[in-house]
């Protein structure tokens, strides 16, 4: 699995990403809710378009 940094505006709606040590689900062009940690699941926040996020790319074994 490879990770890369991307601006929030480039994360597709419906995609998961990481920011600030939490795992998030992008709900709209400006909002996302926490998936992990579980005790904060469902709490949502506004993000700036240029806020940095980490995305993970699944790679096939041997590539």
Predicted regions: what is each one?
Residues 17-60:
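Acidic, low-complexity, intrinsically disordered interaction modules
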Residues 1-12:
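Mixed-charge, Lys/Arg-rich low-complexity intrinsically disordered regions
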Residues 1-2, 59-63:
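Short intrinsically disordered terminal tails
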């Amino acid at each position: 699995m490879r990770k890369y940094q991307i601006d929030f505006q480039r994360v597709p709606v419906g995609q998961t990403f990481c920011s600030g040590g939490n795992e998030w689900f992008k709900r709209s062009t400006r909002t996302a809710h926490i998936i992990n940690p579980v005790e904060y699941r469902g709490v949502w926040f506004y993000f700036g378009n240029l806020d940095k996020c980490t995305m993970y790319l699944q790679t096939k074994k041997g590539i």
